[in-house]
Structures are given as structure tokens and as C-alpha cells.
Amino acid sequence: MKVMIDTNVIISALLSPHGQAAKAFYKALQPPFEPLVCSYIIDEVQRKFAEKLAAHASKLCRFEDILPLFRLVPMPAETVEGEMFIRDIKDMPILRSALAAGSDYLLTGDKDFLEADIKKPQIVSVAQFLAI
């Protein structure tokens, strides 16, 4: 089962390694799951650490160390079905990548995703993913 892990879950997992987001993050790295990431998410994680979390740079290094465990998926430029349900246009590249990769789940804490009427991939919160 393919899981696209959103930026907010990655950052929460890195900052609180014993928290619920970290548990979901590490669960997604284990079979039967296949963790997915796109260049947009990688760039966003790096940018947020540079802009707001510079004091935690060592935690960013941890992410970069485990990045080879993820499958890097393409980020299509074309509009995809379901985009009209996303309020924040900055989230569209993530949805496009998840759809192009055939992701089963999008693991996120982003309310714009969680409240959107998107059927595929299944949008799940940390708590929902931990219950799978």
C-alpha cells in the first residue's frame, strides 16, 4: 500500500520523535506500506527548517538520512480530478504526485486535505492511519 506522507507529518515526526505523528511516520516506512515523497514535499520540509526551525537542523539531517527509504515520485504539471476540492493551491502538487504514483493513502494533518471531498487517494489523519 502506497502512502504519500505530507510535510506537516514529516516535520512533526522529526520534532517529536515519540509522538503520534512519529509513530504514523515510522509505520508508513514498514511493509506492507511503501512510503512516497515528491520533490515539492522535500523542498517544503527543507524550506520550513531553514525559515522557522534552523535550531533543529540536526533533525532535518535525520530526514535526509532516511530519504532513501522513500520512493521519489514525479510531480505532474497537469490538472487532476479532485483539485477543485483543495482550498490551498499550494497543496495541489502533493495531490497530483499522489495520484500519479497511484498512492492509496495521503497521510496528513492538513485540514484542507482532511476536509476535502477526495476519494482517491484516501486522505487520512495520523490517528486514522495508526488505526489501519
Question: What residues fall within each predicted segment?
Answer:
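Metal-dependent nucleic-acid phosphoesterase active-site entry motif
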Residues: 1-18
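PIN/NYN-family metal-dependent endoribonuclease catalytic core
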Residues: 5, 21-51
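A secondary-structure boundary/capping signal
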Residues: 6-7, 37-38, 109-110, 125
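Alpha-helix capping/helix-boundary segments
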Residues: 9-10, 41, 112-113
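Residues that scaffold the ATP/ADP-binding catalytic core of kinase and kinase-like folds
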Residues: 13-14, 48, 116, 132
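Domain-scale selection of a single, long terminal region
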Residues: 39, 43-81
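Active-site neighborhoods of divalent-metal-dependent phosphate/nucleic-acid chemistry enzymes
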Residues: 71-106, 111
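Acidic, PIN/NYN-like endoribonuclease modules and their adjacent C-terminal/linker elements
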Residues: 104-107, 111-132
